[in-house]
């Protein structure tokens, strides 16, 4: 074989490999750009809204657990601190909302309530803050970083979950009315089985997230709003418990009324306009 032909074949192979690498890099770059922009569209919540935040949540996607499975709670239900505070729950009608692929922020993609329902939901949280004013107050969310949360006044005196969450018990995502709440294992099982929410995909995976950190779907009507009020009350009862209660033996601390009641609130932002960043 002529020497020039012998060298031509490796050069062709190297050129082909280089072109293939360029094509793959271009496709990967295009996918990354689309994925990054779609993630930004969810709004802020827990991570910085920049490439660093996207890289973190992209890595955490690999660690997500099944958000609907309740087997994780089976071993906990009969242990101290896992008692039920909820009564029987009716099943939520219709399919569950579609949930975005990224674990942070944890958001849904459809079934959004109207502004009137979001306002009514804020009133439910306001009422809970007043009812349990001796035990909880409104404070900047430890998890979301940008909006308010129902938080224990003294996390050290509450359930071990409260110490893990810095006292945070529940918060609303102002853009769509979805929520996160922390329940007992028994109540988390009931909420998931009845279709009212799902487990955060990193709950129990990351050490700072209790395994019963649950995403609660936003209410669509008055009947569902009443269910959410029950869920919120159960979450507060769980977090203010001593951690030694067992099924049928609730030993949570009753809230003490303050001497001078104060108006507390968890006000959300109005729905964002297209392209606007939200929590």
In which residue ranges do the predicted regions lie?
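Charge-dense, helix-prone N-terminal extensions
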Residues: 2-279
């Amino acid at each position: 074989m002529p020497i020039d032909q012998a060298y031509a074949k490796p050069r062709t192979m190297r050129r082909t490999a280089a072109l293939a690498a360029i094509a793959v890099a271009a496709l990967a770059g295009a996918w990354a750009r689309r994925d990054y922009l779609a993630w930004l569209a969810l709004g802020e919540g827990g991570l910085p809204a920049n490439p660093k935040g996207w890289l973190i949540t992209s890595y955490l996607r690999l660690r997500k657990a099944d958000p609907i499975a309740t087997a994780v709670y089976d071993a906990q239900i009969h242990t101290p601190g896992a008692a039920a505070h909820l009564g029987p729950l009716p099943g939520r009608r219709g399919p569950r909302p579609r949930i975005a692929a990224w674990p942070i922020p944890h958001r849904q993609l459809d079934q959004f309530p109207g502004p009137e329902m979001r306002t009514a939901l804020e009133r439910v949280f306001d009422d809970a803050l007043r009812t349990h004013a001796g035990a909880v107050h409104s404070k900047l969310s430890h998890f979301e970083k940008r909006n308010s949360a129902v938080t224990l006044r003294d996390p050290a005196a509450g359930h071990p979950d409260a110490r893990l969450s810095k006292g945070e018990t529940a918060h609303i995502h102002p853009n769509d009315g979805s929520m996160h709440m922390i329940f007992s294992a028994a109540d988390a099982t009931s909420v998931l089985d009845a279709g009212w929410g799902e487990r955060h995909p990193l709950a129990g995976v990351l050490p700072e997230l209790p395994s019963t950190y649950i995403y609660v779907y936003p209410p669509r009507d008055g009947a569902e709003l009443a269910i959410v009020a029950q869920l919120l009350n159960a979450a507060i009862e769980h977090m203010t418990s001593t951690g030694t209660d067992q099924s049928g033996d609730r030993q949570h601390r009753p809230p003490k009324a303050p001497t001078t009641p104060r108006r507390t609130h968890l006000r959300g932002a109005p729905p964002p306009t297209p392209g606007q960043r939200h929590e």
